[in-house]
Amino acid sequence: MRHTWLAEKNVIRFFGDPEPIQKNYHVPDFSADIGNLPVKASVHIQCGVALEDAVIETEFIQAQSNAHGLANAIIAFCDLTQEDAQAQLDAHQMFPNVRGVRQIVGRDAVEDARNGTNALLENTKFKDGLITLSARNLSFDLQLTPPLIAAAAELFKSIEDVPVAICHAGSPQDFTKDGMRDWQAGLKDFAEHGNMICKISGFGMFDHDWTVDSIREKVLRVIDIFTPARIAFGSNFPVDKLTASYADTMGAFLKITQDFSSHERDDMFYNVAKDFYRI
């Protein structure tokens, strides 16, 4: 199984220098990062495996789950534009923990232009593939950048029977006043989708020196737009391990939400993810 980005040397990614995490990261490693925090379950989101090894990744994660009790749900990779996409989905769904698919639409303008992912939203084969997910009882994890939100919102509001989870709160990267305004407007557009949740995670990818105070207003704004009933906090580990520990990451989210009710916090830290990923 080949994760191409793990083999790259001296390549700075949009989230920084990956060298410290360019190694195997299995359930025991994740458990060590969790430490004593009361994590009950986890979701594995596909992580850059070579196209031809996508099903092998799913098989491996299922074996990890069988052996260690984590991950409890798998979001697999499938290129929905390919002729064999349905056969690929059939193969993924042979494994019981598979709940959905992620095909990244946007990471960073430079990488997207190089990989061509920023053209997915205009590809009719991509939409055709998305439409088939509902009949398979599969969801879609949507990773993209703010400039792509308007086109993505138009696409996904046309196929609302497909459950969608926005990754990393839409990946805000432009922290200017105009950038924050456009990002929030895009999230409001997304929130009109009746079958969509928003995951809050990944701030370390775009702000390597983040603090509780630097992300507080962003977090609270996302919650305000989607409401606690449609929010799920995530760790984005091991990528966010580059900028903070698991305890510090979750501790920041807990501190920011300390004024919410226990029911609202249960939703954001447990129930929404449990229900969306059918754990």
Where are these regions (language model features)?
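Conserved, mostly hydrophobic/aromatic
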Residues: 42, 74, 101, 133, ...
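Active-site gating/metal-coordination segments in enzymes
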Residues: 52-147, 154, 197-206, 213
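A generic "structured core" feature
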Residues: 1, 35, 116, 124-125, ...
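Mid-to-C-terminal alpha-helical segments outside catalytic/metal-binding sites
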Residues: 6-37, 41, 220-221, 225-232, ...
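Catalytic pocket-lining loop regions of alpha/beta-barrel enzymes
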Residues: 5, 116-232
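Active-site gating loops and adjacent loop-to-helix segments of metal-dependent hydrolytic enzymes
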Residues: 2-43, 95-117, 162-163, 194-197, ...
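Catalytic metal-binding/acid-base residues of hydrolase active sites
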Residues: 48, 79, 170, 203-204, ...
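Alpha-helical scaffolding within the catalytic cores
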Residues: 22-31, 85-87, 150, 178-187
